[in-house]
Amino acid sequence: DHLRALDSSVNEKEIAEKFGWKYYLPEAKQEESVNVKLAEIRSNYKDLKPTDILCIDPCMGSGHILIAMFDVLMDIYTSTGYSEREAAFEIVEHNIHGLDIDQRAYQLAYFAVMMKGRGYNRRFFRGRDDVKPMPKVYAIAESNDILRSHLSLFGQSMEVKRRETAKEQMEYLL
């Protein structure tokens, strides 16, 4: 919808073929009132940047959905002019988030996201501007016994900005 908002002459089927999507269903005909509402929604997408897209898998397991999201996001980023190298960092930094209650699943998901980034950028592990990539995937054991006052102890080894963001996200989840 974002590409269509930028250029109404865009052909959905051609976009699907360009992205290499195997399955495509054209948009079904709608009532006029629905078309009006869709046009309104699409106009809101006109200024959408790829970094504004938030994808979260609340039960990420070993990260299969995160990796599928990574590929779709890579198509979006490259279609808007990003190189695959730069897009790999942007996706990990801005788009993909995952949670799981199993520590081992978290480790597998973290590994999967890091390897996917490495697949698109040979220098991915080195980081960008001296900042190492840090996938936003987390293991949440159980929150029944977590007190909000304990959040002040959370993330002491993280840089201040990342710690504050993580604490805000944790407060929201609690």
Sequence positions of predicted segments:
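SAM-dependent methyltransferase catalytic region
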Residues: 1-174
